[in-house]
């Protein structure tokens, strides 16, 4: 089981899931900054 979690596909899925979670949480607290990064 340990070998499964150390595999590259699992690491990639975990990285994408973590990044998506950070973006979602950031967008929840600061909804305008994601769509207007330069203050336009």
From Swiss-Prot:
Cystines in this chain: none
Keywords from the UniProt entry: Membrane, Photosynthesis, Photosystem I, Thylakoid, Transmembrane, Transmembrane helix
Residues annotated as transmembrane: 4-24
GO cellular component: photosystem I; plasma membrane-derived thylakoid membrane
UniProt subcellular location: Cellular thylakoid membrane
The keyword Transmembrane helix is assigned to this record: yes
Listed InterPro entries: PSI_PsaJ, PSI_PsaJ_sf
Record membrane topology: Single-pass membrane protein
Record has NAD as a keyword: no
Gene Ontology biological-process annotations: photosynthesis
Known function: May help in the organization of the PsaE and PsaF subunits.
Family statement drawn from the similarity comment of this UniProt entry: Belongs to the PsaJ family.
The protein's name: Photosystem I reaction center subunit IX
Organism of provenance: Prochlorococcus marinus (strain MIT 9313)
Gene that encodes it: psaJ
